Amino acid sequence: MPINAIRTCFRWLEYEYSRHALDQSIVRAISDEEIQEAIECGEIIEDYPADKYGPSCLILGLTREQRPLHIQCTYPQLNTVKVITLYQPDPERWIDFRKRRLQ
């Protein structure tokens, strides 16, 4: 259910970026279109119920070009999702981009 609610917000363009996420999308050359593609096929891989922005999650999704993206966003609040941060996961730090490697 939560991923479907997040997808619905993205389909209806009911989302916004934190300043950090906007900066990171520019620095890491991640387009809005790629973010939408990743959310559409994505899965929640981590849950952050006590995050400072409110309950949020980490989504792993692939773009049309098969680029893996991690997108941390809030669960819908007042029909809006806030993207907190986003990045292309480092395979040295993630197993199959889904599970954190032990350091």
What are these regions (language model features)?
Residues 1-103:
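Ribonuclease/tRNase effector modules and their secretory precursors
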